[in-house]
Structure formats: structure tokens, C-alpha cells
């Protein structure tokens, strides 16, 4: 199975989960709170750069919540996603004519069509960035803006989380055996997730975008905390700190996600 097929399968299986994340205005879990923060930062960047009525493409639109929110705020929005399940959900709940299945490496719109692009939680699942950056630059108008997120490669919490996940999957056969001995309910076995999830260092990422005609104009980092241990820590405190220090250069290395707002140079 190719990388794109794996990603498509993963997100098609979790459509309802993602819908619940975005529909909950006050999510309890830290991971969900950080998704809400990411969306808020992206909207703030778009509103700071583009007037109402601008044409916006949400690449990797998922269930369509962000595109719908931007439309509610007065933008002319479209959405594309690799997952048929995600697009079906967006069409059912929002504008049917504005969502379609498409690959970020082959965006189905003409050159210089959009004033803005939002691309949240997409780049890390690609094999390479080159084609995606080239396509975003192509469909942006000269001077158009894109807001793109990438996970940070230096966030310490990421490595803690990965270790905890591996431990959890390693001990699952043992916990299953104990549960059987005690006559408890059996849970279906789940394989360790194999979908790739690349991470980025700011300097290298900025250089790569610049080499594809995308000049950095704004930058923020967010999402603090270890998801694997979130039940043991005050989640609200982590999220408040993440929001407060989103543009603090000394503390950005702690955050797990990076948002870059870039302008298309043509």
C-alpha cells in the first residue's frame, strides 16, 4: 500500500472522530484543544492578510469545518481532501459544490486562481514537499498568501509521546492476557500505526519555501504538552501557555506545531 493510500485509509476511518473534535467548542482533551488553537491561529493569519471576499482554498480540508468558518466570516471558500469520506462529510454538512477529492500535488484549479490557501496538518504525511509547494505557488495569485502548518522536529514532547505509544503497543498483549484471565471484555487487536509523520526544523523549512517562491511573513508555534500523559497534567495550563507564547522566539522550540504565513512571489 502506498503512503497516500495509507493516509487515505487512516482518515477515512476516522471521519466521525475528526468531526467531533471540531464541533466541540470546549474540548476536554489537550490534543483537541490544540487543534482548536491551530485553527484559530490560521484564521487570524488569513484575516490579517486578506480582505473579506477573497478566494480561499483549504487544502486537506477534512470535514470542512475550517472552510465553512471562513465562509461564515465572508470569504469565498473551496476545499479539497484526499479522503473521499472526509469530502462526503463536508458536502453533506456544508456547500456541496465547493468540496472535492483531490491530491495536493495535483490541485485541480487554474494558475493564479486563489488569493489565499490554508494547509493544516497535511505536509507531514507527504513523501516529499516539492510538488505540494510548487502546486500551492501555482494556484496562488501574485502576492497571495498561504498558511501552512508543520510539526516541529525539535519538540521534546514528540519524542516522549512516541516512546509512550511504543510502550503501550508493546505491553498490549500482556494486558490482553490479564484481561482474559479475569474474564474481562476483549478488545480487538490494533497494529502499531505505520503512517509516516515527518517533522521539520524552522530554518530548513523557511529556505525550502523560499526556493519555491513563498516568502515568510508571519510565524507562530503552538501546542505544548505530552499527549501520552495528558490525563495527569492540568491541560488548560498547557494550552494557555501555548497560546501566550506562540510568537516567543525563546520558547518556540517547546511547541510541537509551527504555522507559517507566506506570500507568493511571482
Residue positions per predicted region:
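Conserved class I S-adenosyl-L-methionine
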Residues: 1-50, 53-60, 147-177
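A conserved beta-strand element that flanks and buttresses the S-adenosyl-L-methionine
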Residues: 118
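A C-terminal cap/extension of S-adenosyl-L-methionine-dependent methyltransferases
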Residues: 168, 179-198, 202-210, 216-266
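Class I SAM-dependent methyltransferase SAM/SAH-binding core
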Residues: 63-106
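Short catalytic micro-motifs in class I SAM-dependent methyltransferases
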Residues: 121-125
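A short glycine-rich, Lys/Arg-flanked "PGG" loop and its adjoining helix->strand segment in the class I
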Residues: 130-142
Amino acid at each position: 500500500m502506498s503512503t497516500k493510500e495509507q493516509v487515505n485509509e487512516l482518515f477515512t476511518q476516522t471521519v466521525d472522530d475528526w468531526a467531533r473534535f471540531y464541533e466541540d467548542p470546549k474540548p476536554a482533551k489537550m490534543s483537541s484543544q490544540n487543534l482548536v488553537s491551530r485553527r484559530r491561529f490560521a484564521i487570524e493569519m488569513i484575516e490579517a492578510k486578506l480582505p473579506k471576499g477573497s478566494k480561499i482554498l483549504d487544502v486537506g480540508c477534512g470535514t470542512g469545518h475550517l472552510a465553512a468558518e471562513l465562509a461564515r466570516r465572508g470569504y469565498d471558500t473551496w476545499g479539497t481532501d484526499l479522503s473521499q469520506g472526509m469530502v462526503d462529510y463536508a458536502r453533506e454538512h456544508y456547500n456541496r459544490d465547493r468540496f472535492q477529492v483531490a491530491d495536493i500535488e495535483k490541485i485541480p484549479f487554474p494558475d493564479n486562481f486563489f488569493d489565499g490557501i490554508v494547509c493544516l496538518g497535511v505536509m507531514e504525511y507527504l513523501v516529499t514537499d516539492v510538488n505540494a509547494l510548487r502546486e500551492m505557488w501555482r494556484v496562488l495569485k501574485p502576492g497571495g498568501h498561504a498558511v501552512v502548518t508543520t510539526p516541529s522536529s525539535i519538540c521534546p514532547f514528540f519524542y516522549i509521546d512516541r516512546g509512550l505509544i511504543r510502550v503501550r503497543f508493546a505491553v498490549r498483549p500482556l494486558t490482553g492476557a490479564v484481561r482474559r484471565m479475569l474474564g474481562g471484555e476483549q478488545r480487538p487487536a490494533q497494529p502499531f500505526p505505520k503512517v509516516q509523520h515527518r517533522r521539520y526544523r524552522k530554518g530548513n523549512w523557511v529556505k525550502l519555501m523560499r526556493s519555491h517562491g513563498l516568502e515568510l511573513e508571519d510565524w507562530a508555534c503552538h501546542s505544548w504538552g505530552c499527549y501520552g500523559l495528558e490525563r495527569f497534567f492540568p491541560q488548560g495550563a498547557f494550552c494557555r501557555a501555548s497560546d501566550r507564547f506562540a510568537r516567543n522566539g525563546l520558547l518556540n522550540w517547546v511547541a510541537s506545531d509551527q504555522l507559517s504565513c507566506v506570500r507568493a512571489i511571482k
